[in-house]
Amino acid sequence: MLAVVKIDGEKVRRARERAFLSKGELAERAGLDRNTIGRIENAGATEVHPRTIRKLANALCVDPASLTPQE
């Protein structure tokens, strides 16, 4: 079974905008596809591989927990 974690797309978008990055710039920094960034941001809360949330958090210089939904 593949491990997944929830990510909050709105929090990703806000963190990206605070860092003054475009979706393409974030994708390049995180080593992800620009379409993946768009899907995450538009999905609200969605499930991703733990590696994806770590890549995004590192690229945004934030704690991975700050990108997860409050439960």
Summary of predicted features, one role per range:
Residues 10-29, 54-55:
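Short basic helix-loop element that most often maps to the first helix and adjoining turn
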Residues 61-71:
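Short C-terminal boundary/hinge segments that cap the last helix of small helical domains
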Residues 1-18, 65:
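A short, Lys/Arg-rich alpha-helix, primarily the initiator
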Residues 12, 26-27, 37-40, 67:
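Conserved hydrophobic/aromatic packing and binding residues within compact polymer-binding modules
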Residues 41, 52, 71:
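DNA major-groove recognition helix of helix-turn-helix
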